[in-house]
A protein has these predicted regions:
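Helix-loop-helix junctions within the multi-pass membrane cores of secondary transporters/permeases
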Residues: 2-36, 57, 78-87, 91-139, ...
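Membrane-embedded alpha-helical modules
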Residues: 93-214, 350-460
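Hydrophobic/aromatic residues within the transmembrane alpha-helices of Major Facilitator Superfamily
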Residues: 23-30, 63, 67, 144, ...
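Alpha-helical membrane-protein architecture signal
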Residues: 12, 16, 191, 270-274, ...
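Juxtamembrane transmembrane-helix boundary signature
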Residues: 58-79, 110
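Loop-to-helix transition at the N-terminal end of transmembrane alpha-helices
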Residues: 44-63
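Helix-loop-helix hairpins and the membrane-proximal interhelical loops
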Residues: 1-49, 167, 212-307, 451-455
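Helix-coil boundary and interhelical linker segments in multi-pass alpha-helical membrane proteins
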Residues: 38-49, 88-99, 266-270, 368-370, ...
């Protein structure tokens, strides 16, 4: 039966290899079950409900990938997009998380339509290659900065941001912080970065997840030793799992189907929607092509067979995820870990999906993991995204300058969408004024986007 469903022999694999690959993929991306609730709770969402939504979105999306495309790719709420959701749209722009979920829902619907045609691939090809890489790099810096903030490694100060002093006077959330609460967590987060770095260098499977768990374990030891004292005023809570409700699955009701369609025709909504579309579009296609090329899944023309099914799975998962109550669901680059273990078919994805389903019963463990333990994961994931800087052509200043503006704008303005806006505007203007626009054959879509972004800055 499995042979017939997934064409194992045709793909030169077997059940044992596929199952092992699925377990490996889950191990490398299970950190999202701890990180996503941590990030989205900053936007005012219930962390328990977000955990459930995250696990369900990953389960549904990964299963759809197996059914619609028969590929060993796993999906879950994406890093970068969840940070944009919480820190830019909600905290930065002042919109409700319900409004942000509506933008994610709209993005999913649009992607379903685009994925059933060839438009999604056409849009991908319209954006300059260098600018695509710059967006990834900028998001990497943004995520790393968010990680350092969550761990209180950097805090607000007289120079806008400054390092937390382990033995000096610090203000966190407007309250004086002591070494026994925030100070020790800063130290643990730094140790966590070192531990995770060692695991990455040693190529340990599930390195990010193991980094989180080890850092959390060190924190628990510090709590028992009296070095860490929970202090809710500065966001430091008990590090021990709360099993008072047993292994009950946290209710989805606080966030399920909480969409807000008021104001969806505003320019702000269009900008927010485009940012979700833009990042998810390139992240998904880039991951699909990158991982599949390593596994020799591309055809002789360099194209991925059944890509329409893979894109449709991604689009449906995003729409379902928004209804469940989480940010954009996308294909994870960590799928490469399962592929490296020999995963070649949807059976790998089915295995990963089942494990995400089972994780629903372990919510007390994942929800007890503190932000100082997930911060190293954000910082290291930021590094992975930063590697795309090597794909930018810095020898051509008409390409380098817009990419540079795009990259630095994201962490400096604390907004992914501002980075994209400034990058697109700068790219079009510089190439027009230097006479290179015709030579580069800049697409009509780029001109439309540049005009929309300029209007946004003028009227908003």
């Amino acid at each position: 039966m499995l042979e017939k469903l997934f064409k194992l022999s045709e793909n030169k694999t077997d059940v044992k290899t596929e199952v092992l690959a699925g377990v490996t993929t889950f191990m490398t991306m299970a950190y999202i079950l701890a990180v996503n609730p941590s990030i989205l709770s900053a936007a005012g969402m219930d962390s328990g409900a977000v955990f459930t939504a995250t696990a369900l979105a990953a389960f549904v999306g990964t299963l759809l990938m197996a059914v619609l495309a028969n590929y060993p790719f796993a999906l879950a709420p994406g890093m970068g997009l969840n940070a944009y959701f919480a820190y830019t749209v909600v905290i930065g722009m002042g919109y409700s998380w319900q409004y942000a979920l509506t933008a994610v829902f709209a993005e999913g619907i649009i992607f379903i339509v685009l994925s059933m045609t060839n438009v999604r691939e056409a849009i991908f090809n319209a954006i300059p290659r260098n600018l695509k890489s710059a967006v990834s790099v900028g998001i990497g810096l943004f995520i790393a900065f968010v990680g350092m903030q969550n761990a209180h490694i950097v805090i607000g100060g007289s120079t806008l941001i400054e390092l937390f002093s382990l033995d000096g006077y610090n203000q966190v959330n407007g309250v004086e912080a002591a070494f026994s609460d925030v100070g020790i967590t800063v130290l643990l987060a730094i140790i966590g970065v070192i531990i995770t770095g060692i695991l990455v260098i040693k190529n340990v499977k599930g390195n990010i997840l193991w980094g989180i768990l080890i850092t959390w374990g060190l924190g628990i030891i510090c709590q028992f030793a009296g070095l860490y004292v929970p202090n809710a005023e500065v966001g430091c809570y008990s590090l021990l799992p709360d099993f008072s409700n047993g292994l009950a699955i946290p209710s989805l009701s606080p966030i399920f189907c909480k969409l807000d369609f008021k104001g969806i025709f505003s320019l702000d909504f269009i900008v927010i929607l485009f940012a979700f579309l833009f990042v998810d579009l390139f992240d998904t296609i880039g991951t699909l092509v990158g991982v599949s090329s390593k596994a020799d899944m591309l055809d002789k023309d360099g194209k991925l067979p059944r890509i329409k099914g893979a894109l449709l799975a991604d689009a449906i998962a995003t729409t379902a995820g928004a209804v469940l109550g989480t940010s954009t669901t996308t294909t994870f680059v960590e799928s490469a870990s399962g592929v490296s273990e020999g995963g070649r078919t949807g059976l790998t994805s089915v295995t990963t999906a089942i494990l995400f389903g089972l994780s629903l019963f372990l919510s007390p463990i994942f929800l007890a993991i503190p932000s100082f333990a997930t911060a190293p994961a954000l910082i290291i994931v930021g590094l992975y995204m930063l590697t795309n800087v090597m794909n930018i052509d810095f020898s051509d200043m008409s390409e380098a300058i817009p990419c540079y503006i795009c990259i630095i704008a994201m962490p400096f303005f604390y907004s992914i969408s501002e980075g994209i806006s400034m990058g697109v505007i700068t790219y079009v203007v510089l190439n027009l004024l230097t006479g290179k626009a015709k030579e580069k054959k800049i697409s009509a879509l780029m001109y439309v986007l540049a005009v929309l972004f300029v209007l946004k800055y003028i009227f908003l």
